[in-house]
Amino acid sequence: MGSAVCEAVAADDLLDLVGAVDPSSSGDMDSTGTVVVSDSIEDVDPTEVDVAVDFTVAEAARQNVQWCADHGIHAVVGTSGLLESDLVSFRAAFTSSNCLIAPNFAIGAVLLMRFAEMAAPFFPTAEIIELHHDNKVDAPSGTAMRTLERMAQASNEWGTDPTELETISGSRGGTGPGGIQVHSVRLRGLVAHQEVLFGTDGETLTLRHDSLDRSSFMNGITLACKAISEHPGVTIGLDTLLGI
């Protein structure tokens, strides 16, 4: 993901790639041949940076995002697995720069979350199936969690799960806000996919989004890099930047 972000930033006429961080390839040139990869964000000269993009893991992101706040640098964060306590800390820390945390930077995925929120009041039952590559370490995905939250906020009249017996424990998935069930699939060959299934008397509605490769996230990431300076504090989701 980091290489794809570097390439997208370098290809954008309004952005300049000034640094990259990856302990596994420190000392090498980045995938665009523009900058030498650093071992740690502490090795980056903060005076050269306006915006930092973080796609790591939650533990590393906590340190990287705090570094941005400490140096007055805007942060665009796509790392999943962050907790509500992290958001509280970030809101307190970002006083001289801004931070965007988004569960998904694919425009279609952002629209899917909005459509699910719109549909929620009209259907008493719903379930989410999220499918990702087999290197994803957290479940459910951040996109699924955000979708659940928005659906639960849009309606409080969800039907109860009728299942009384699970022959295999956990076969009904996990239970999210509003009692909505969520199922996580991890398979080789996948990138990032999500289905939201709604049901009511005599009809169903299925919303689905598929990211077929990582290029699907790049337009959202470069948009965020260019717009984050106009959104004070901590913003959750790409919705505000898209005006939806």
Region locations from a protein language model:
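Conserved NAD(P)H cofactor-binding loop of Rossmann-fold oxidoreductase domains
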Residues: 56
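N-terminal Rossmann-like NAD(P) cofactor-binding module of classical short-chain dehydrogenase/reductase
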Residues: 52-53
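Rossmann-fold NAD(P)-binding glycine/threonine-rich loop
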Residues: 59-74, 78-101, 106, 110-119
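C-terminal substrate-binding/catalytic lobe of Rossmann-fold NAD(P)-dependent oxidoreductases
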Residues: 2-46, 124-244
